[in-house]
């Protein structure tokens, strides 16, 4: 086991504080509409430029191990805030820095660290309750646009694209961000349920000019099995042919004479038919087939449920207004499933998302949720260079997370105003002793830090602006972009309540742990043995010289 370097008390805290300040100072320059860029060196390729707090935090590693521990603990604040709300990483880092700096001053002055932490926690609990009272619902397109615009660093085009995407696919719909091919940002919406499986034979194509299969008002047969024997399918094929409607077959696989028979029937015009493989694998395939059956109002023909393909009737088949099949994808539009069945399935998937432990499972469940609830929107980010593309894509993803958080828990006045108002409302809060009161004051002082930094980044005097904002009421605040005072909601400067709440809670949690730190332990740096061994022969030779 390697030897350890151990530091205690004030010596340990000073080292830790240096690390906290290095990381926080690098992150906080990005805050606000006039925040600056940070250039990150890469081991290969061009440097990347970002205004995203968590991207900056992730890049920072310090040489001194004790200082690095402080930096890594603040990095945890940014990561946790990012995981919880997808935004607010810079605010969280700034709050943590302020609490740690003020808290450690109090510890150095002889205050009890545990009581300080209790005071900070008490202030944060009260502040979160006040934030909930200040919060207003964010449901209309205008408010969503404003939140997206603020989070994308005042890029109105991004804000309006996100609002348009949410309008088209619903608040629960999946919105993905991709790198575009042009200079302009684009929004592409895929309505209905789409999955990554194309036609099993190009002979099914009935739109040769576009190379796709289109079926109008088709029946949909779903089978959780391989189909290779044509006899199994004959009864249902005859029933569909009599109805005059087209047929889509979704099965684990379709091969041999069964596929050949379908192709021949389709080419002769006896029955308009197409076949695709079921999406997913294993249990996920079963679940997705069940989703499709609920969406289309049919049943999955499954041997596990003692259902046989030969005995299936038209009542077992699903229906949709339209199906479009390309080489790689199948899209089912306008399924005729019952609304309440679809809603109960959506509720079930939401429950599974809450219980899921892995990010991969959550991602796949969210995809299924979106396909059932309305569709998928793809935001294609346009830029002139690859460096700009990466920076812009990170901003758009932040803005998307922020708007989702806003829809979930509502919005409060932005620009650091909400925390200043909350601090004003709980200014009379008291703890059980004077040390706890100091902890409360540390937290209240920290709540001004985001506003002060936004003002500082815009080139104005933080104390003057902060006092002016404190003298105002309600949503009255400072618009750093235009250098004007007024109602932040009217200015369109909004912050999601969830983002502000998460930033405050995670900052206080980690900062409280740092204030109560008394000892730090790390590995001693290893000595370079090669330099010692290289010097010994010279010493020996010197000795021989002396003997002569």
Swiss-Prot record:
The keyword Transferase does not apply. Gene3D superfamilies: GroEL, GroEL-like equatorial domain, TCP-1-like chaperonin intermediate domain. One of its GO terms (molecular function) is ATP binding. Its EC number is 5.6.1.7. It is found in: Cytoplasm. Keywords: ATP-binding, Chaperone, Cytoplasm, Isomerase, Nucleotide-binding. It holds the Pfam family Cpn60_TCP1. ATP binds at residues 30-33, 51, 87-91, 415, 479-481, 495. Forms a cylinder of 14 subunits composed of two heptameric rings stacked back-to-back. Interacts with the co-chaperonin GroES. NCBIfam families: GroEL (TIGR02348), PRK00013.1 (NF000592), PRK12849.1 (NF009487), PRK12850.1 (NF009488), PRK12851.1 (NF009489). Belongs to the chaperonin (HSP60) family. This is Chaperonin GroEL.
């Amino acid at each position: 086991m390697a030897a350890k370097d151990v530091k205690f008390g004030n010596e340990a805290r000073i080292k830790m504080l240096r690390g906290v300040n290095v990381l926080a100072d690098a992150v906080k320059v990005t805050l606000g509409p006039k925040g600056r860029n940070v250039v990150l060196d890469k081991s290969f390729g061009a440097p990347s430029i970002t205004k995203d707090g968590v991207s900056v935090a992730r890049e920072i590693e310090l040489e001194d191990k004790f200082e690095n521990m402080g930096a890594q603990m603040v990095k945890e604040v940014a990561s946790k805030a990012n995981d919880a709300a997808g935004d607010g990483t810079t605010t969280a880092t700034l709050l943590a820095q302020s609490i740690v700096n003020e808290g450690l001053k109090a510890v150095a002055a002889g205050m009890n660290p545990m009581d300080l932490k209790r005071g900070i926690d008490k202030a944060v609990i009260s502040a979160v309750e006040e934030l909930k009272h200040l919060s207003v619902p964010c449901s209309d397109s205008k408010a969503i646009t404003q939140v997206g615009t603020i989070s994308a660093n005042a890029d109105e085009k991004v804000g309006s694209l996100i609002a348009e995407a949410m309008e088209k696919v619903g608040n629960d719909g999946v919105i993905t961000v991709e790198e575009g091919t042009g200079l302009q940002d684009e929004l592409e919406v895929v309505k209905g349920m789409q999955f990554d499986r194309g036609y099993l034979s190009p002979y099914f194509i009935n739109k040769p000019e576009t190379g796709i299969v289109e079926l109008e008002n088709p029946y949909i047969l779903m089978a959780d099995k391989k189909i290779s024997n044509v006899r199994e399918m004959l009864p249902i094929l005859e029933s569909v042919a009599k109805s005059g409607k087209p047929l889509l077959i979704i099965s684990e696989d379709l091969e041999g004479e069964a596929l050949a028979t379908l192709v021949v029937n389709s080419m002769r015009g006896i029955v308009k038919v197409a076949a695709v493989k079921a999406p997913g694998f294993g249990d996920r395939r079963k679940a997705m087939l069940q989703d499709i059956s609920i969406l289309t109002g049919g049943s999955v023909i499954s041997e596990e449920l003692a259902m046989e393909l030969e005995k299936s009737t038209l009542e077992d088949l699903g229906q949709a207004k339209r199906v479009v099949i390309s080489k790689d994808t199948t899209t089912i539009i306008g399924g005729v499933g019952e609304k309440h069945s679809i809603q109960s399935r959506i509720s079930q998937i939401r429950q599974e998302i809450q219980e899921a432990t892995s990010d991969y499972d959550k991602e796949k469940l969210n995809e299924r949720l979106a396909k059932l609830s309305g569709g998928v929107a793809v935001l294609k980010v346009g830029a002139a260079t690859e460096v700009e593309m990466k920076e812009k894509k990170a901003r758009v993803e932040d803005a998307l997370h922020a708007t989702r958080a806003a829809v979930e828990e509502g919005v409060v006045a932005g620009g650091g105003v909400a925390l200043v108002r909350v601090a004003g409302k709980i200014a009379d809060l008291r703890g059980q002793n004077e040390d706890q009161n100091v902890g409360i004051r540390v937290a209240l002082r920290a709540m001004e830090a985001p506003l002060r930094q936004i003002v500082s980044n815009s080139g104005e005097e933080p104390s003057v602006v902060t006092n002016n904002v404190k003298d105002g009421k309600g949503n009255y605040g400072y618009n750093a972009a235009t250098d004007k005072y007024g109602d932040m909601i009217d200015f369109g400067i909004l912050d999601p309540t969830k983002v502000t709440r998460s930033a405050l809670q995670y900052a206080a949690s980690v900062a409280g742990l740092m204030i109560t730190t008394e000892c730090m332990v790390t590995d001693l740096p290893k000595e370079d043995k090669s330099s010692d061994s290289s010097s010994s022969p010279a010493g020996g030779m010197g000795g021989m010289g002396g003997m002569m």
